[in-house]
Curated annotation (Swiss-Prot):
Keyword flag Cytoplasm: no
Protein name per its UniProtKB record: Quinoline 2-oxidoreductase alpha chain
Pathway in which this enzyme or protein is active: Xenobiotic degradation; quinoline degradation
Origin superkingdom: Bacteria
Subunit (UniProt): Heterohexamer of two alpha chains, two beta chains, and two gamma chains.
Organism: Comamonas testosteroni
Reported function: Converts (3-methyl-)-quinoline to (3-methyl-)2-oxo-1,2-dihydroquinoline.
Length: 11
């Protein structure tokens, strides 16, 4: 996704 980081993080 565009924000893979967001998906990896709890928030």
């Amino acid at each position: 996704a565009k924000s893979d980081v967001a998906e990896l993080k709890p928030r």
